[in-house]
Amino acid sequence: MQKNSSKNIQDRVVFITGASSGIGYALCEEYLRQGWNVIGLARDDTKIPNETIDNPKFEFVKTDLSNFDSSKQIIDEVFKKNANISTFILNAGIYIPDSLNDFNFENAKATFDTNVLSIYLSIELIKKNFELNSNYTLAIMSSTAGYKGLPKSILYGPSKAALINLAEAIKSEMHDNLNVKLICPGFVETPATKVNSFKMPYLMSPKDAAKIIYSKIYKKGFEISFPFPFNSIMKFGKVLPYKLYFKITEKKFSKK
């Protein structure tokens, strides 16, 4: 089991899943810009620009995290070869538009395999290979969609809610012995949001999201939630009585 002993940022290594597009790729770019070595893991390397692939400080690892057997072996090998990894950003996720009337079990399984179970797989391998302490950062990418049940989010929302609970559970167990970060973005321009037909308030670019995350990930605090005020509005929904909450959702998302 490896201990983190690297103090020079030039020697630090960050491990990022879901690294081929959206926030994941933007985080790879931001960490490279900050001088880190980056290990980016994703199922598709064709989306990553050649200039990033050719960067000597970037290593791409191709695997489909929903294929647990092959991913377990691949990630285990990566961790064994990279003792200086000090930050783990578990960002892999998929989004399938869904509602009660059109969802099916296959889509539900695909969503939870990637969005939830792949995170558990990564964490199992992290704790196996590293002696986690306050020098390490474990960041879990959830979403403001996980704060409360929303119409037409019967798969994605619950998967992100599970990650919020998971991050809270790890933090409540580790306290200050591990820098645990829960990341809950609002609407970000990603392949996932491109399929949405509804208005997305405070939509922001992945690059801006990555800058916010990097600016806060090593500071005090547990949750990185943005943008304001959208995140505050979504958080407010968590404390509303159900009767009032459902009246609001009925008004805002009424059937047409």
Please provide the spans of the model-predicted regions.
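Conserved glycine-rich cofactor-binding loop
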Residues: 20-21
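Conserved glycine-rich Rossmann-like NAD(P)H-binding loop of the short-chain dehydrogenase/reductase
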Residues: 34-49
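Conserved NAD(P)H cofactor-binding loop of Rossmann-fold oxidoreductase domains
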Residues: 91-96
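Substrate-binding pocket helix/loop in short-chain dehydrogenase/reductase
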Residues: 99-100, 104-112
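Active-site helix of classical SDR
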Residues: 123, 159
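Residue(s) in the substrate-gating loop at a strand-loop-helix junction
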Residues: 143
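C-terminal helical subdomain
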Residues: 182, 198-234
